[in-house]
Amino acid sequence: MTAQGNIYGINGPIIYLKGDSGFQMNEMVYVGTGRLVGEVIELTSERTTIEVYEETTGLKPGEPVTGTGAPVSATLAPGILTSIFDGIERPLNAIQKESGCYIDRGIHADSLDTKKKWHAHMTVKKGDRLYPGA
């Protein structure tokens, strides 16, 4: 079950929720009715602090915040080498198709085409020891 809360305060890209709302540190969350992407950056018994990675203009106290149950992460795969992304790994070409030259708030786009097959040559096999920097 994912954690949920409501916005209590807003200060630029930082929003606050009252009390312990059940989120985890570094958890990716969706903020407001526009489902803006954010990350939990502080947890105390009094409040939860979240940094929103999109423009927060128009957000207001009382709007919902929904957790994903997973940390903010990036997809690593051969397909990302030929794409250009914004700061939260949304491919700019997919965003342009959806919103034109400007990035609308709350746009969600997969960072990788999951239908495409990627050919990879594995250089390790089961049981091999791996070392840092190798």
Cite the ranges covered by each PLM segment:
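Acidic-enriched and Gly/Ser
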Residues: 2-3, 9-11, 17-134
